[in-house]
């Protein structure tokens, strides 16, 4: 039972979601040439770093978590794990994760993981989440790091492919997070967290959601146009983007914003999972000229 508490405080659901993303970035860069030890080190190392960030986030959020129905049962709120023990747990996970990334990948990969960690723990959790409606935007930078870390573990450089992944996953985070904020609106209001639906209302948030999905759609095409992914990926990217946009647009005449937001959230998981899988397997592209060049 005690082991389960230490597992739960690390938010295993978030870790699993990031595993899919980091694998997508890794396989995209590897293009069929997989080094098993590098893959394992990247996946395990980043998982430990993410787990560490989640534990420290739980420690920081103890005061606001007790006001939210979704989070008031967390072990850091109920006292099932002491603050001292949770902090030690988080720090050990972080040291192990960064140590493994430094030892088995490359300095750039470790630095990118460190940047994401700093943004999530230092900027988002400690400051922006509590004080600004732009906290979601700041947090999206850390949420977009896993696929970039996976990609750069192979490539060793931050190129256009890495930049495309950063844009795709940053832009995806916004509608995904806003959907959560809408169907959990009362929780955020009770905790005094100024997410966009609380600060400016659901109507304004719906506009932002549509605009971010349009930007996400454009960003997903960059991997194919730049020669990093193939036509299968392109087909899936267009399909999931259009379907996600269609769901977003139904929000303008929905009778129940919470039901609509849950649908939007659920499909966001489908969309990003589908893209991660496709970029993992559809790396066969035309040589050098790339699709964008072949159009002229």
From Swiss-Prot:
**Where does the record place it?**
Cell inner membrane
- Gene Ontology CC annotations of this record: plasma membrane
Pfam families (alphabetical): UbiA
Q: Give the metabolic or biological pathway.
A: Porphyrin-containing compound metabolism; heme O biosynthesis; heme O from protoheme: step 1/1
Q: Which GO terms describe its molecular function?
A: protoheme IX farnesyltransferase activity
Q: What biological-process GO terms show up in the record?
A: cellular response to iron ion; heme O biosynthetic process
Question: What reaction gets catalysed by this protein?
Answer: heme b + (2E,6E)-farnesyl diphosphate + H2O = Fe(II)-heme o + diphosphate
Q: Which InterPro entries match?
A: Protohaem_IX_farnesylTrfase, UbiA_prenyltransferase, UbiA_prenylTrfase_CS, UbiA_sf
Q: Which Gene3D superfamilies match?
A: UbiA prenyltransferase
> What does the record give as EC number?
2.5.1.141
* Disulphide bridges, residue numbers: none
* Alphabetic keyword roster: Cell inner membrane, Cell membrane, Heme biosynthesis, Membrane, Transferase, Transmembrane, Transmembrane helix
Q: Where are the transmembrane segments?
A: 7-27, 36-56, 83-103, 108-128, 134-154, 163-183, 207-227, 229-249, 265-285
Q: How does it sit in the membrane?
A: Multi-pass membrane protein
Miscellaneous notes: Carbon 2 of the heme B porphyrin ring is defined according to the Fischer nomenclature.
* Task of the protein: Converts heme B (protoheme IX) to heme O by substitution of the vinyl group on carbon 2 of heme B porphyrin ring with a hydroxyethyl farnesyl side group.
Family recorded in the similarity comment: Belongs to the UbiA prenyltransferase family. Protoheme IX farnesyltransferase subfamily.
NCBIfam families assigned to the protein according to its UniProt record, in alphabetical order:
cyoE_ctaB, PRK04375.1-1
What name does the UniProt record give this protein? Protoheme IX farnesyltransferase 2
């Amino acid at each position: 039972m005690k082991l389960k508490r230490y597992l739960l405080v690390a938010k295993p659901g978030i870790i699993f979601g990031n595993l899919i993303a980091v694998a997508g970035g890794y396989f995209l860069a590897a293009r069929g040439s997989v080094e098993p030890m590098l893959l394992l080190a990247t996946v395990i190392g980043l998982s430990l770093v993410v787990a560490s960030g989640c534990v420290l986030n739980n420690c920081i959020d103890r005061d606001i978590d007790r006001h939210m129905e979704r989070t008031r049962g967390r072990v850091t709120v109920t006292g099932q794990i002491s603050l001292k023990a949770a902090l030690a747990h988080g720090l050990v996970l972080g040291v192990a994760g960064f140590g493994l990334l430094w030892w088995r990948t490359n300095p750039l990969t470790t630095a990118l993981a460190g940047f994401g960690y700093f943004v999530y723990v230092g900027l988002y959790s400690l400051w922006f989440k509590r004080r600004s409606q732009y906290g979601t935007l700041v947090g999206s930078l850390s949420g977009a790091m896993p696929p970039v870390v996976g990609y750069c573990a192979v490539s060793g450089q931050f190129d256009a492919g890495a930049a495309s992944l950063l844009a795709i996953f940053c832009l995806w985070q916004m509608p995904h997070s806003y959907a959560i904020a809408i169907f959990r609106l009362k929780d955020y209001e009770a905790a005094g967290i100024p997410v966009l639906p609380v600060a400016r209302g659901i109507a304004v948030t719906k506009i932002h959601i549509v605009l971010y999905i349009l930007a996400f759609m454009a960003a997903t095409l960059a991997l194919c146009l730049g020669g990093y992914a193939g036509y299968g990926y392109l087909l899936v990217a267009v399909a999931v983007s259009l379907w996600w946009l269609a769901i977003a647009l139904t929000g303008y005449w929905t009778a129940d914003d919470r039901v609509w937001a849950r649908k939007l959230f659920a499909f966001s998981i489908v969309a990003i999972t589908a893209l991660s899988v496709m970029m993992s397997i559809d790396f066969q592209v035309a040589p050098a000229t790339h699709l964008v060049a072949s159009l002229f």
